[in-house]
């Protein structure tokens, strides 16, 4: 699954590293004399050509450029240093630069090409040679402005760089950065020489010095010894040339690792190895809070191991902790979910371990250069070097490349590359793995088994969604689901959602539909647990909710009713249970199952109806699903088919089922952050064409499910008899327009004889309600509103006028000027002459203009109403119930152009004339001073402001 190639940074041919000419997965540098000797070998020529055509470095030679340096001589010097001195500290300073600190104080900077794994430049720094406070260096850390060295005594060497390196790439000489070096004596035991270790925080202003604990050892009592000297963990603050002690602590057990929390730099997390009196070994994770000069332990977690811990590492995001023991057992502890996974008896002893920079993969190795990679579920990842054959294996053995097997000291992945600094169109790389051997050589493994610098959520690397996608391509969906289950929705929500979608597409569109895949999909959906935070649920619940609905209908198409019922209980939507009922009612063996599904649907309706405050089911109950699609005529035909009314619960139950399953579904509503309702423009019908809203009566809540279905049957059968239109059509005023979601005008429906409509009011009188019939269409008069032309509150509704008064008002109304007229040079209107003293014209005949027939108003600012939060069910929020058809609510929801949706239509109604208008200055009443002036401009007409928005 992972593809890589190894570059050995050495020029020694047969003395240390032995690589065959046919091996295209391992490389080493050739000297000029080696090149001349291999001219006769065609395989060597082909491999060298293969390397150079890919911008690789095959033959090492000195360059005349000063910036590049003498690379061949520097590499030879590096190999001599590796044989003579120990490496105290090694780290990746960025994605393409390695820093090595040797025991005598020399620093080596190695610049690496991330696309090939070759050395670009090498610089040696000798500033610290001869300036050490002690002979043995145990640890060090390097920041942009400080270098701190620790020894096996209670001393520190601090180098302050007053002019840090301003170069974006490449190292800089310490002497050019104005260094200031000083030595500090820190608290601690002076009688014993213990190795001091250093850890710095992300802000580079606090660091920790820690050693082994000595609580189990016997100390000679002295009255002058302090608690600071007995403590083994010390926290210091560094700023410029000042070093200040902040806090200290004496741990109960020997710490293996001490680090600062990334989320809070005032907290420290430690990993300690505890050995009980019985000899049981466990790992304890402790967190400390820095307060008032002391370290207070706030939490502790114990992980049983059973054997001595030989390798450990926190993930870069500090959510996972890897532990390996000498008995070949490994475990992965989740610090967020507080869960631990174990893998017993792996194939190698995990002496070294390293996390990938994306925190989705880790690599373990033994001392003989045998590597093994694991994902977040502790499943082995196949790994192989570049070859002509596809031979992935769980183990990658590099030991056969060495003549004398060296000891592998450490492995370390490079940091995440900054894509802005690397511009390459076709090259691919995921990371570099540095292998440090005792007495050399150094090796660099370039892994490009991922998607390169594009394709995943972070645009580079081996993230969890990339690994899961590779598992799906290899027909291993169980491993992909395990990776998803190991992710945390709180911190990697987007990555979890992408992985969940990939698994869903694999299940829905896979060639062979097997039951194990369906079980894996159900398990993947359960990773979005109800225990997540409200912020995470609000952000991802809609997408997960849609996937659950898709999966439920997928199960229905496969006739897997039991699994679909389980998902339907989690989704809790009415239409899914009705689809289950419609599909299983005709199967005799599933009759009880159908009744349970029907009762679940009725219970959901009753629950949501009670939550909405509307306990009457006389309104239309319609489904959302296309599986239960029907028309109103089908419902009427189903009601008219009955020849005689029946009484009792047993008679009303089939009728209620027939009515409940034949409702017309409205348009599906959805909630999206990208495409919302405010982007939809809807043409509002005129008030004259809009029918009145039906009045719905309020009935007391039913006491049982049986009475609920009986009540719904009686109410729905009474509605047609009392809703007859004078033209003979049934339900002519409450049939919604399914194309727009708004009530439409009366449309012709199939006429039914009155004898086909049974009258059940006598039999079911105790359950019947008295719904008020809507007023006739002929007597319906829309009420108009008048809005002022200035910003303010909208006045209350005004009384309507009779037709005679309305005509009188129209005759008395004076026409106003058009807003499109030019006030600087107005045209003569209404028989008036322009106010020009030099020229007079005869009066013209009155003309009807567009501005004289329309009056418009400015919609004033209306305080926005706080929208209620959607109801939460099963731990996540989703859109409100959409199967209950409320015409008034649907009309308000479909008008997003103005925020007070319930008062939206009044802003577009014609303005009545019985309201006192603002005074209009007529031209006859204008002062004569306007015409006495010498200007030729006429008096400006009064113009009404038009604005179809909110002021």
From Swiss-Prot:
UniProt-annotated location(s)? Cell membrane; Cytoplasm, Cytoskeleton, Cilium axoneme
Q: Which SUPFAM superfamilies match?
A: WD40 repeat-like (SSF50978)
GO terms under biological process? cilium organization; establishment of protein localization; imaginal disc-derived wing hair site selection; nervous system development
Listed Polar residues bias regions: 709-720, 757-771, 818-828
The segment annotated Disordered runs over: 709-776, 816-883, 903-951
The UniProt entry's GO CC annotations, sorted and at most eight, read: axonemal basal plate; cytosol; plasma membrane
Q: Which domain of life is it from?
A: Eukaryota
Please provide the record's keywords in A-Z order. Cell membrane, Cell projection, Cilium, Cilium biogenesis/degradation, Cytoplasm, Cytoskeleton, Membrane, Repeat, WD repeat
Q: Which residues form a coiled coil?
A: none
**Presence of keyword Amino-acid biosynthesis:** no
Residue ranges, compositional bias (Low complexity): 930-942
**Where does the UniProt entry say this protein principally localizes?**
membrane
The protein's matches in Gene3D superfamilies, at most eight in alphabetical order, are given as: YVTN repeat-like/Quinoprotein amine dehydrogenase (2.130.10.10)
Q: Where are the WD repeats?
A: 304-343, 345-384
The text of the family note is: Belongs to the WD repeat fritz family.
Report the function annotation for this chain. Answer: Probable effector of the planar cell polarity signaling pathway which regulates the septin cytoskeleton in both ciliogenesis and collective cell movements. Functions cell autonomously to regulate wing cell hair polarity and number.
Q: What is this protein called?
A: WD repeat-containing and planar cell polarity effector protein fritz
Q: Which organism is it from?
A: Drosophila melanogaster
């Amino acid at each position: 699954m992972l593809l890589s190639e190894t570059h050995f940074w050495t020029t020694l041919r047969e003395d240390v590293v032995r690589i065959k000419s046919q091996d295209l997965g391992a490389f080493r540098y050739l000297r000029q004399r080696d090149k001349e000797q291999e001219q006769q070998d065609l395989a060597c020529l082909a491999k060298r050509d293969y390397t150079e055509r890919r911008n690789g470095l095959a033959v090492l030679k000195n360059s005349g450029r000063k910036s590049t340096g003498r690379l061949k001589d520097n590499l030879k010097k590096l190999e001599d240093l590796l044989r003579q001195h120990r490496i105290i500290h090694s780290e990746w300073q960025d994605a393409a630069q390695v820093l090595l600190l040797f025991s005598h104080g020399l620093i080596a900077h190695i610049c690496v090409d991330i696309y090939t794994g070759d050395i670009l430049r090498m610089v040696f720094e000798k500033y610290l040679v001869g300036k050490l406070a002690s002979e043995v260096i145990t640890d060090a850390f390097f920041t942009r402005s400080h270098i701190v060295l620790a020894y096996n005594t209670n001393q520190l060497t601090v180098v302050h760089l007053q002019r840090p390196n301003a170069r974006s790439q490449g190292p800089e000489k310490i002497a050019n950065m104005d260094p200031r070096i000083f030595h500090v004596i820190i608290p601690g035991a002076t009688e014993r020489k213990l190795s001091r270790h250093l850890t710095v925080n992300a802000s580079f202003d606090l660091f920790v010095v820690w050693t082994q604990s000595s609580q189990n050892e016997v100390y000679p009592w002295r009255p002058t010894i302090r608690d600071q000297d007995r403590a083994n963990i010390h926290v210091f603050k560094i700023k410029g040339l000042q070093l200040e002690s902040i806090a200290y602590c004496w741990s109960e057990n020997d710490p293996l690792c001490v680090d600062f929390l990334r989320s809070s730099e005032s907290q420290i997390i430690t990993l300690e190895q505890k050995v009980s009196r019985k000899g049981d070994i466990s790992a304890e994770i402790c967190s400390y809070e820095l307060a008032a000069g002391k370290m207070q332990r706030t939490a502790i977690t114990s992980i049983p191991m059973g054997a001595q811990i030989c390798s450990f590492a926190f993930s870069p995001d500090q959510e996972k902790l890897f532990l390996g023991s000498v008995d070949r057992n490994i475990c992965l502890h989740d610090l967020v979910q507080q869960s631990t996974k174990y893998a017993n008896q792996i194939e190698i002893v995990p002496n070294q371990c390293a996390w990938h920079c994306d925190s989705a993969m880790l690599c373990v190795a033994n001392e003989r250069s045998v590597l093994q990679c694991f994902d977040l579920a502790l499943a082995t990842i196949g790994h192989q070097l570049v070859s002509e054959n596809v031979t992935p294996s769980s183990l990658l053995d590099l030991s056969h490349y060495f003549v004398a097997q060296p000891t592998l000291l450490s492995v370390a992945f490079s940091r995440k590359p900054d894509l802005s600094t690397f511009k390459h169109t076709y090259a691919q790389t995921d990371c570099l793995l540095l292998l440090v051997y005792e007495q050399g050589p150094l090796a660099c493994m370039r892994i490009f088994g991922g998607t390169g610098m594009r394709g995943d959520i972070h645009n580079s690397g081996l993230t969890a969604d990339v690994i899961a996608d590779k598992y799906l391509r290899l027909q291993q969906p169980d491993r992909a689901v395990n990776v998803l289950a190991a992710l945390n929705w709180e911190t990697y929500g987007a990555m979890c959602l992408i992985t969940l979608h990939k698994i869903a597409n694999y299940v829905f569109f896979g060639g062979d539909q097997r039951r194990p895949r369906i079980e894996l999909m159900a398990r993947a959906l359960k990773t979005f647990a109800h225990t997540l935070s409200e912020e995470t649920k609000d952000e991802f619940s809609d997408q997960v909710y849609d996937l659950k609905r898709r999966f439920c209908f997928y199960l229905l198409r496969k006739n897997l009713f039991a699994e679909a019922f389980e998902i339907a209980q989690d989704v809790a939507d009415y239409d899914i249970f009705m689809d289950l009922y419609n599909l299983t009612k005709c199967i005799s063996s599933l009759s009880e199952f159908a009744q349970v599904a029907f009762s679940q649907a009725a219970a959901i309706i009753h629950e949501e109806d009670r939550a909405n405050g509307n306990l009457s089911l006389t309104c239309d109950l319609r489904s959302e699903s296309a599986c239960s699609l029907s028309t109103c005529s089908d419902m009427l035909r189903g009601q008219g088919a009955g020849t005689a009314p029946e009484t009792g619960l047993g008679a009303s139950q089939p009728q209620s089922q027939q009515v409940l399953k034949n409702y017309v579904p409205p348009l599906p509503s959805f909630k999206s952050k990208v495409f919302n309702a405010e982007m939809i423009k809807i043409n509002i019908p005129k008030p004259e064409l809009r029918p009145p809203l039906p009045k719905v009566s309020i009935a007391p809540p039913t006491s049982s499910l049986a009475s609920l279905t009986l009540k719904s049957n009686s109410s729905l059968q009474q509605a047609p008899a009392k809703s007859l239109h004078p033209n003979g059509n049934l339900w002519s005023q409450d049939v919604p327009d399914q194309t727009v979601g708004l009530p439409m005008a009366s449309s012709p429906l199939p006429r039914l004889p009155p004898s086909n409509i049974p009258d059940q009011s006598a039999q079911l009188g105790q359950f019947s309600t008295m719904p008020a019939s809507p007023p006739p269409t002929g007597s319906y008069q829309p009420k108009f509103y008048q809005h002022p032309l200035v910003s303010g509150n909208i006045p209350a509704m005004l009384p309507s006028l009779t037709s005679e008064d309305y005509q009188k008002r129209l005759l008395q109304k004076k026409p106003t000027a058009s807003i499109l007229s030019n006030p600087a040079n107005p045209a003569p209107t209404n028989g008036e002459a322009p106010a020009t003293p030099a020229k007079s014209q005869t009066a013209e005949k009155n003309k009807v203009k567009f501005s004289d027939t329309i009056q418009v108003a400015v919609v004033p600012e209306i305080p926005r109403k706080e929208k209620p939060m959607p109801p939460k069910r099963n731990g996540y929020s989703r859109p409100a119930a959409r199967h209950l058809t409320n015409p008034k609510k649907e009309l308000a929801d479909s008008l997003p152009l103005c925020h007070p949706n319930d008062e939206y239509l009044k802003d577009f109604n014609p303005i009545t004339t019985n309201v006192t208008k603002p005074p209009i200055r007529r031209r006859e009443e204008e002062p004569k001073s306007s015409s006495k002036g010498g200007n030729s401009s006429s008096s400006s007409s009064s113009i009404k402001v038009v604005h179809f928005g909110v002021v």
